[in-house]
């Protein structure tokens, strides 16, 4: 088990802060409209709390103590990141906060759903099973997997705002009887031992201070014989932390995506085994070079892969030109006190992260979809 000493936080105090920050915006349609309905002072405090971990911390000056500080404060870092980034994610990407592979001629929406189906298939989720979604976002993947499998899914999320939005979307789609969303920390899950038939995590456990720690908690709440599947964000074996440019890419990904620290593939494999899982399968789904669209194409201004108007709009919102328009628009809205102060700084941080993701993807330094499937032993 990891020896990292984690800093505790006051859940009641955080809940009160989040309610002031978001107000009724969790009940809005999301995206830009929700962004305009934040409390200005609380938003500024969230911006300061998040960016203190990255401001004036350059790749060439990075020392282990800086990364350790982020790791110790992972809960605060992650919660404030999603307090700031959720509305921008919904505006620019979708309600499924993850990447995916693309088949020939496949639209963005279909590819996102297929990526979720593929994980559910690998885990063997069936109708009536009790399933846990670790780090569920606003519930996009959970809703899709419920519709695909007929299982009951419980979503766990440290961010109260996202939990509230996930519940609203589930009710809107008539899925409240199949979905439940719980606010909590995946390093100390609020569930009894042996609670779930299957567990999955889609690009979420990267926020953990210790992969072994979060995988161990997943094993604890999984029933004996149950299957856990994860799409993990990992640096590849090519990544060299002593290479300053590669380190900058990694640090920009961490800044733009609310990550305390990234690990390499061998670390992820060691962690899932050390947590007590029998590793059934592992594969870097981003490594397949079959001539189809790369996973990062929506961030890379490459219109040739767009299949419909919705894809074109996604590309425009996420590419450099769209981000430049958003940068200037938010600046005007902040100056007019329509958008809360710090919104542009947040958007610029996400943009820096997006550029690093593309660069890391092209250079094969990083994967957002390292698939690991593990089984909890029948007898423990």
Swiss-Prot record:
SUPFAM superfamilies given in the database record: S-adenosyl-L-methionine-dependent methyltransferases
Pfam families to which the protein is assigned, alphabetical: Methyltransf_11 (PF08241), Sterol_MT_C (PF08498)
Reaction equation(s) it catalyzes: lanosterol + S-adenosyl-L-methionine = eburicol + S-adenosyl-L-homocysteine + H(+)
Gene Ontology molecular function terms on file: sterol 24-C-methyltransferase activity
Pathway this chain belongs to: Steroid metabolism; ergosterol biosynthesis
UniProt entry tagged with the keyword Transmembrane helix: no
Recorded GO CC terms: endoplasmic reticulum
Database matches in InterPro entries: Erg6_SMT_methyltransf (IPR050447), Methyltransf_11 (IPR013216), MeTrfase_SMT (IPR030384), SAM-dependent_MTases_sf (IPR029063), Sterol_MeTrfase_C (IPR013705)
Source taxon at top rank: Eukaryota
Known EC number: 2.1.1.-
Function noted in UniProt: Sterol 24-C-methyltransferase; part of the third module of ergosterol biosynthesis pathway that includes the late steps of the pathway. The third module or late pathway involves the ergosterol synthesis itself through consecutive reactions that mainly occur in the endoplasmic reticulum (ER) membrane. Firstly, the squalene synthase ERG9 catalyzes the condensation of 2 farnesyl pyrophosphate moieties to form squalene, which is the precursor of all steroids.
Family membership noted in the UniProt record: Belongs to the class I-like SAM-binding methyltransferase superfamily. Erg6/SMT family.
Record-linked PANTHER family: HYPOTHETICAL LOC100005854, ZGC:194242
More about this protein: In Fusarium, the biosynthesis pathway of the sterol precursors leading to the prevalent sterol ergosterol differs from yeast. The ringsystem of lanosterol in S.cerevisiae is firstly demethylised in three enzymatic steps leading to the intermediate zymosterol and secondly a methyl group is added to zymosterol by the sterol 24-C-methyltransferase to form fecosterol. In Fusarium, lanosterol is firstly transmethylated by the sterol 24-C-methyltransferase leading to the intermediate eburicol and secondly demethylated in three steps to form fecosterol.
Protein name: Sterol 24-C-methyltransferase ERG6B
Protein source organism: Gibberella zeae (strain ATCC MYA-4620 / CBS 123657 / FGSC 9075 / NRRL 31084 / PH-1) (Wheat head blight fungus)
